[in-house]
Amino acid sequence: MSGDPSEEELEELRKKKMEQLKEQQGGEGEGQEAAQQQAEAQKQAVLKQNLTDGARKRLNTVKMSKPQVGEQIEQQVVALARSGRVQGQIDEDQMKELLSELTPDSKSFDIKRR
């Protein structure tokens, strides 16, 4: 009969240990999430400071259609701003130039029917 209480105690200890592990993992995830949110907020602040309204609209349009290209452009603008190579704000024409540099020329295909 002495085995039954020890099994209950073991089960209780297991539950406590599992709860502790879950709390630790949850705490780390929250810390990473908070850091990501802070980094995203800083990136948005830099973009808002260095892009005109037209350039920001164009960037948002690109992000909607091609998210990877939009992220590349954002990273490029942030890098340029942090290195001090941006004079004034980037307008829509400069944004078009950045887009044309980072996106390869689209290939056209001619389909001929016989």
Swiss-Prot record:
Residues 32-45 have a biased composition (Low complexity). One of its GO terms (cellular component) is cytosol. Residues 1-45 are annotated as: Disordered. The keyword DNA-binding applies. Residues 12-22 have a biased composition (Basic and acidic residues). Residues 1-11 have a biased composition (Acidic residues). InterPro entries: DNA_bind_arc, PDCD5-like, PDCD5-like_sf. One of its GO terms (molecular function) is DNA binding. Keywords: DNA-binding. Belongs to the PDCD5 family. HAMAP family: dsDNA_bind. This is DNA-binding protein rrnAC3180. The lineage of its organism: Archaea, Methanobacteriati, Methanobacteriota, Stenosarchaea group, Halobacteria.
